[in-house]
């Protein structure tokens, strides 16, 4: 008898499921009351002297048969404008920690060459420098993110670069900028206080790096009306100790010597920076899409 009642109960449940009417649901979307704002600058891009990103990639020179504007490839400008990049970072990356900006200004035929020690050991002629990069940024209508050389450079070198870029006062650096063809200062939104200083930027520990950026930051905000966002080097992956040290004010003055922290996370492949073979390309795609 119990089995019969169980069968009847099961039948009633099945029938009720068949004849039940679906409930009407409504979704209300209020477009004028956003909950959060996604900062556009997290979608910024990076241009480093790595492989053919700069030479042959962005820069081909004024005499190239590839269509260009003042040496910068027109197709690259169009592609980057089409995706609407908010900011562009240059010259690195690890390359920034060997780059001395004064070698990349003035007449191109007078610029000294540089050996790209981090990426392939190739020799570059420095024909793409500060003026060329800022020209590119203005073509794109995006913000400039300059990365300074904290690893092998000096405080004075970095401070003079900021002055050259942004100052409107009468000074040796602004006179030099005008001599090189740019009367008005540029607008620079972001300035990196080194790059990956736990590795290629000097193999520093976080306490030492923190002390270094206190000196550098002191002298990079002194010029013109351009308020620069100083970006410090963040951790390698999940190195929480680096972050803890960076976010804790040191010494008698309780302030952080930076405005933002750069984060670094990579998918590594066993390949080379230039002249990648077919396997290198497929490995890159596979590791980044998995």
Predicted regions located by residue number:
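Extended catalytic-interface subdomain
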Residues: 256-268, 274-289
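N-terminal signal peptide c-region/cleavage motif recognized by signal peptidases
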Residues: 15-17
């Amino acid at each position: 008898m119990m089995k019969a009642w169980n069968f009847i109960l099961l039948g009633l449940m099945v029938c009720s499921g068949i004849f039940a009417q679906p409930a009407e649901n409504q979704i209300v979307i209020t477009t004028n009351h956003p909950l959060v704002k996604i900062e556009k600058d997290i979608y910024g891009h990076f241009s480093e002297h790595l492989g053919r990103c700069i030479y042959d990639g962005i820069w081909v020179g004024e005499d190239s048969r590839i269509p260009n504007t003042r040496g910068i490839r027109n197709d690259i400008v169009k592609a980057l404008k089409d995706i609407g990049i908010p900011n562009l970072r240059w010259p690195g990356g690890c390359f920034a920690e060997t780059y001395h900006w004064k070698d990349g200004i003035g007449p191109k035929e007078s610029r000294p060459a540089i050996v790209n020690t981090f990426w392939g050991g190739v020799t570059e002629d420095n024909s793409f420098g500060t003026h060329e990069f800022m020209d590119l940024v203005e073509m794109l209508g995006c913000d400039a993110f300059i990365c300074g050389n904290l690893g092998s450079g000096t405080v004075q070198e970095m401070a003079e670069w900021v002055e050259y870029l942004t100052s409107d006062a009468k000074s040796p650096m602004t006179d030099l900028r005008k001599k090189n063809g740019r009367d008005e200062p540029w607008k620079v939104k972001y300035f990196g206080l080194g790059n990956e200083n736990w590795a290629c930027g000097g193999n520093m520990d976080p306490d030492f790096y923190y002390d270094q950026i206190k000196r550098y930051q002191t002298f990079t905000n002194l010029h013109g009306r351009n308020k620069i966002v100083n970006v410090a080097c963040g951790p390698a992956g999940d190195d929480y100790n680096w972050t803890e040290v960076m976010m804790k004010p040191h010494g008698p003055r309780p302030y952080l010597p930076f405005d933002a922290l750069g984060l670094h996370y990579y998918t590594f492949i066993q390949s080379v920076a230039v002249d990648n073979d077919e396997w290198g390309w497929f490995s890159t795609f596979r590791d980044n899409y998995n």
